[in-house]
């Protein structure tokens, strides 16, 4: 079989186009093989730029790259939730996969709670694949990649990046390293908590209103950071109107990278640039104006009209 034309895939994806089904399958298989080599806690070196949820907002992802620099000039960590809710989940995920395939050491993709079969069948990605390809094969190829995505990244051994937050079942990074990640996200337990939990002003742990994961407080965060010799926990998973938010004596930061979320929230987005572990700079960006994006029709037009 001919080798993958990764340059072509990147170029197609950059134009907000999706690949022919067979090319997408080959790209997904290729990225799965790359992800197989990655640890549950993937080491990453500074300088690096950390990004939060994207949710299928393709044109805003392009704005993110204009703000932070293109791959491979900038080294990126994306903390999950690439798909669902936005108009272009398929094109967004395809673009990130193509970049990962072409420059695997310059972009680290973490799993979010939306990188799941169950969630994508409810929040849009499954239906989008069905509409654009006429079948669910593309969705199946992508969900195989979901299962392979790593769950955390560790910047210079001192900054932990994870989609959601902490778990009462995890005290050390080594306990994250032993999780069996190649599966659908379970309904409860350590793996589930890492992608579903939220920081909150609670004593230790509290039931999460999301119905999965936990709410965790400053005491829990400080203990975890201390035991694991960390400076900071970076996470995404929650809309922040200002783009980012520090909590718990600046031991934790939420980074949100989907501006004007769902095309109506009016929020700013951010990415967090780490020159080194002690030098961080948030970069803010706004949604691309409607004149610069293509708004797809609500439903596909029947062929015979």
Swiss-Prot record:
Reaction it catalyzes: O-phospho-L-seryl-[protein] + H2O = L-seryl-[protein] + phosphate; O-phospho-L-threonyl-[protein] + H2O = L-threonyl-[protein] + phosphate
GO MF annotations, alphabetized: metal ion binding; protein serine/threonine phosphatase activity
Subcellular location: Mitochondrion; Cytoplasm
Residues annotated as catalytic: 114 (proton donor)
Superkingdom of origin: Eukaryota
Subunit relationships: Protein phosphatase 6 (PP6) holoenzyme is proposed to be a heterotrimeric complex formed by the catalytic subunit, a SAPS domain-containing subunit (PP6R) and an ankyrin repeat-domain containing regulatory subunit (ARS). Interacts with subunits PPP6R1, PPP6R2 and PPP6R3. Interacts with subunit ANKRD28. Interacts with IGBP1. Interacts with MAP3K7. Interacts with NFKBIE. Interacts with TRIM14 and WRNIP1; these interactions positively regulate the RIG-I signaling pathway.
Cofactor(s) required, per the database record: Mn(2+)
Family to which the UniProt record says this protein belongs: Belongs to the PPP phosphatase family. PP-6 (PP-V) subfamily.
Swiss-Prot/TrEMBL induction comment: Regulated by IL2/interleukin-2 in peripheral blood T cells.
GO cellular component: cytoplasm; cytosol; mitochondrion; nucleoplasm
N-acetylmethionine PTM positions: 1
GO BP, sorted A to Z: COPII vesicle coating; G1/S transition of mitotic cell cycle; innate immune response; negative regulation of cGAS/STING signaling pathway; protein dephosphorylation
Annotated cofactor note: Binds 2 manganese ions per subunit.
Pfam family, one: Metallophos
Function, in words: Catalytic subunit of protein phosphatase 6 (PP6). PP6 is a component of a signaling pathway regulating cell cycle progression in response to IL2 receptor stimulation. N-terminal domain restricts G1 to S phase progression in cancer cells, in part through control of cyclin D1. During mitosis, regulates spindle positioning. Down-regulates MAP3K7 kinase activation of the IL1 signaling pathway by dephosphorylation of MAP3K7. Also participates in the innate immune defense against viruses by desphosphorylating RIGI, an essential step that triggers RIGI-mediated signaling activation.
Keywords assigned: Acetylation, Cell cycle, Cytoplasm, Hydrolase, Immunity, Innate immunity, Manganese, Metal-binding, Mitochondrion, Protein phosphatase
UniProt EC number: 3.1.3.16
Chief subcellular location: mitochondrion
Binding positions for Mn(2+) 2 per the UniProt entry: 81, 113, 163, 237
Protein known as: Serine/threonine-protein phosphatase 6 catalytic subunit
Tissue: Ubiquitously expressed in all tissues tested with highest expression levels in testis, heart, kidney, brain, stomach, liver and skeletal muscle and lowest in placenta, lung colon and spleen.
Sequence positions that bind Mn(2+) 1: 53, 55, 81
């Amino acid at each position: 079989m001919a080798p993958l034309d990764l340059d072509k895939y990147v170029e197609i994806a950059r134009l907000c186009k999706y690949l022919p089904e067979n090319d997408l399958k080959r790209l997904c298989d290729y990225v799965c093989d790359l992800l197989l080599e990655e640890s549950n806690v993937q080491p990453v070196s500074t300088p690096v730029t950390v990004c939060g949820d994207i949710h299928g907002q393709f044109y805003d992802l392009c704005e993110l790259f204009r703000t932070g620099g293109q791959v491979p000039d900038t080294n990126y960590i994306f903390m999950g939730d690439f798909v669902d809710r936005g108009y272009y989940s398929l094109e967004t995920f395809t673009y990130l996969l193509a970049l990962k395939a072409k420059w695997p050491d310059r972009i680290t993709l973490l799993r979010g709670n939306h990188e799941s079969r169950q969630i994508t069948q409810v929040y849009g990605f499954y239906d989008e694949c069905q509409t654009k390809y006429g079948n669910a094969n593309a969705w199946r190829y992508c969900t195989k990649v979901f299962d392979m995505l790593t769950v955390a990244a560790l910047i210079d051994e001192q900054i932990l990046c994870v989609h959601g937050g902490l778990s009462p079942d995890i005290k050390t990074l080594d306990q994250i390293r032993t999780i069996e990640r190649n599966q659908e996200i379970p309904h409860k337990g350590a793996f589930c908590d890492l992608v579903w939990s939220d920081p909150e002003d609670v004593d230790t742990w509290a039931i999460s209103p999301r119905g999965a994961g936990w709410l965790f407080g400053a005491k829990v965060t400080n203990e975890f950071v201390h035991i694991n010799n960390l400076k900071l926990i970076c996470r995404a998973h929650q809309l922040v109107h200002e783009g980012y938010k520090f909590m718990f004596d600046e031991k934790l930061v939420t980074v949100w990278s989907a501006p004007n979320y769902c095309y109506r929230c009016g929020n700013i987005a951010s990415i967090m640039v780490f020159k080194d572990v002690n030098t961080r700079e948030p970069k803010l960006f706004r949604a691309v104006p409607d004149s610069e994006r293509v708004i797809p029709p609500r439903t596909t037009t029947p062929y015979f009209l």
